[in-house]
Regions:
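N-terminal Rossmann-like NAD(P) cofactor-binding subdomain of oxidoreductases
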Residues: 1-161, 165
Length: 166
């Protein structure tokens, strides 16, 4: 695949900084620079926009085949269809979605259920992708009657970090 565009609400300097430095992978060894409204990643020039209105995105003009919807703000077919109406061929949610999407896929577990007529798909949650492949293997090999997991997650924008009753 080829990275064809990035739409990020953060300003261009922040996008470039976050592309250059990663807390897990360290500093990107190649070139990251800004050139007007383009993000230069080595020799690849990627159009960078900051459009909050999905319906106003120029996916058709840019020839976008697949939008990775990673905001977490959009979770249903209606909002995904805004990307489709803007010219994208398909939408993949990087997070859990509502039940009105074509499928929720956990790679290696139910990948075979994907079909070419699906245009809005969810990749499930990070916890699901960490646990379900292992659990599926255990279930197929030994059988699993019940399971409980505990996940420790970094603070995100949506949970309340303190007891509101205090």
């Amino acid at each position: 695949f080829e990275l064809a565009a990035i739409n990020e609400i953060a300003d261009a300097n922040t996008v470039a900084h976050l592309a250059r430095y990663d807390s897990n992978y360290g500093r990107y060894p190649g070139r990251i620079a800004l050139s007007g409204s383009l993000l230069a990643i080595d020799h690849l020039l990627v159009p960078l926009s900051h459009e909050p209105d999905v319906a106003a995105l120029p996916w058709g003009d840019l020839g976008i085949d697949l939008v990775f919807e990673c905001t977490g703000a959009f979770t249903d077919r209606a909002t995904a269809e805004q990307h489709l109406h803007s010219g994208a061929g398909r939408v993949l949610f990087s997070h859990p979605a509502e039940s009105d999407v074509d499928a929720t896929i956990v790679y290696g577990v139910n990948t075979e259920t994907l079909s070419v007529d699906m245009d809005v798909v969810s990749a499930a949650s990070c916890t699901t992708n960490a646990v379900v492949p292992v659990l599926a293997t255990l279930s197929e090999t030994f059988g699993v009657e019940a399971a409980t997991i505990t996940t420790i997650h970094s603070l995100m924008n949506d949970p309340i970090s303190a007891d509101p009753s205090v």
